[in-house]
Amino acid sequence: MSQPIPPEDVWPTYKRLLSYVRPYWFMLVISVIGYALYAGAQAGAAQLAGYLGDTIVNPTDARVLIVSIAPLVLVLFQGLGQFMGSYSMNWVAQQIVYVLRNDVFEHVLKLPQSEYHRNASGRIMSKIIFDAQQVTSAGTDAIIVIIREGLTVIGLFSFLLWQNWKLTLILVTVVPLIALVMNITSKRFRKISRRIQSSMANITHFLGEAIEGSGEVKIFGGQAQEADRFHNVSRSFAKQNVKLNASKIASTVIVQLFVAVGIGFITYLYIHLMGEDLTVGGFLSYITAAGMIQKPLKQLTDVNVKVQRGVTGAASLFELLDTEQETDTGTYTVATKVDGNIDFEGVSFGYDPASPVVRQLNFAIKAGETVALVGRSGAGKSTISAMLPRFFDPDQGRILLDGIPLQEYQLSELRNQIAMVSQRVVLFNDSVRNNIAYGELRSSDDASIIKAAKDAHAWSFIEQLEHGLDTLLGQDGVQLSGGQRQRIAIARALLKDAPVLILDEATSALDSESEHHIQQALEQVMQGRTTLVIAHRLSTIEKADRIMVLDQGQLIEQGSHQQLLEKNGLYTQMYRMNFSEE
């Protein structure tokens, strides 16, 4: 469970959030002017109440005319001020949230892969969606109330001082009590808000798991188990919201009680101290203003919940923004394309440094060579492929491309030299064309896209789709079969035409006929480029120039398919087992 914000971090969070307001200061000034008009109209209403009392006691034509017209004037001023203030502040708040949410999303795209391993995607999504919404609430409703009701309190308080400053100073004695209540409840609000954020992240995480694994849930009869897990996290979310609302109501009632006691005491003193100087108008003006000040004070107390939730949400977003991005200290650029010579020199790596996944790897892959990595599950095959584009850096040793350490390449330059097709195919909710010509390939012409699709044996089903290349695939390519999705991903890699190609279980989701066609296409595309193949089906890598066998993160055998069979080692055992299964 996440910890509440330390008190010493609250003000820095406020300041950092307010820094997003700076570019929009002009609209903020307009908002303040508008709410100043609104506050002035409120004080004018208190004065009008007193004037109305004097008019009833001593009516004259002039007074009757004034009390008839004044309400209309006050309402016009109040409405104008409300519109100016609310429109301007809403505009500013939406700009702040727009910029903040974009900053967070762009930052997330640049996080190292290790962050995605440490944090479930649902928790990151919760920060961007839910936490940003808390900032929106603080940036719109909360700030509007703070400025509008704050200026109203100042206006009414100034009016009370003008009416009778001595009695008003007595009324001020309740302010420290109100401040004490606000301070205590603010700490509680932040603590509960942090728990609500944690509960919301759990809800998002469990929803994602249940939806993505819906097939497994049904096959294994896990509906009741998943429902029970979701009920628990959902109950926690509801429980924390009830606590937050209870604290909010309690603080509001206590503040109103203090104010009511103060007003009652002042009313008693006002009547007894004014004596003969007491007038109906003066009394009504003072008591009306004192009564009116309760409403903005109540709203300022209520808004404290939104402010604290907004600060908590902002702190969560800033925590994500402060997460270190991928380090890109490389300066080496590539004129056209690398040759594709790869060297691993004493490479060790572990997602947990205490438990290395690969240990002291030493091998070289020549340009244009096709090398297959095989081994039991967890042997480190996919880890090796993930280190080539620097998704992860070695804990020890170094990896070289054309004799140059990977860290010396600019990240974008390095990744431009690599195409990858993994077991987990990622397709976007976009057209077939934009899924093949993705990212830096988006300027590709249709002829190149169609050629890549044909080479991947994908064109035969693409041209049968209702809109061809313009057909929308839906989220994660839901409209396509597993084999079709994989062929789209292969077409994307073919279109990139990179000198280094990584195939991580690239044919795992294909049926035998599709796999046969894909193997023919891959044999052609592998020519002239360095290819690293990871496959569970050993029959798919028999034609590799070299096969490297990994066991517990170490390279134990290497050679051609026939050479390894003759050694009668681990590869032979795996091949026989694999062959019998197929």
UniProtKB/Swiss-Prot annotation:
Domain ABC transporter, first and last residues per copy: 342-577
Ranges where the ABC transmembrane type-1 domain occurs: 29-309
EC number: 7.5.2.6
Cystine pairings recorded for this chain: none
Assigned keywords, A-Z: ATP-binding, Cell inner membrane, Cell membrane, Lipid transport, Membrane, Nucleotide-binding, Translocase, Transmembrane, Transmembrane helix, Transport
Intracellular or extracellular location(s): Cell inner membrane
Binding, ATP: 375-382
GO annotations of cellular component type: plasma membrane
EC class: translocase
Main subcellular location of this protein, as a coarse class: membrane
The UniProt record lists the keyword Translocase: yes
Catalytic activities: ATP + H2O + lipid A-core oligosaccharideSide 1 = ADP + phosphate + lipid A-core oligosaccharideSide 2
Function: Involved in lipopolysaccharide (LPS) biosynthesis. Translocates lipid A-core from the inner to the outer leaflet of the inner membrane. Transmembrane domains (TMD) form a pore in the inner membrane and the ATP-binding domain (NBD) is responsible for energy generation.
Subunit comment: Homodimer.
Entry similarity comment: Belongs to the ABC transporter superfamily. Lipid exporter (TC 3.A.1.106) family.
Name assigned to this protein: ATP-dependent lipid A-core flippase
Organism this protein belongs to: Alcanivorax borkumensis (strain ATCC 700651 / DSM 11573 / NCIMB 13689 / SK2)
Biological classification of the source: Bacteria, Pseudomonadati, Pseudomonadota, Gammaproteobacteria, Oceanospirillales
Gene that encodes the chain: msbA
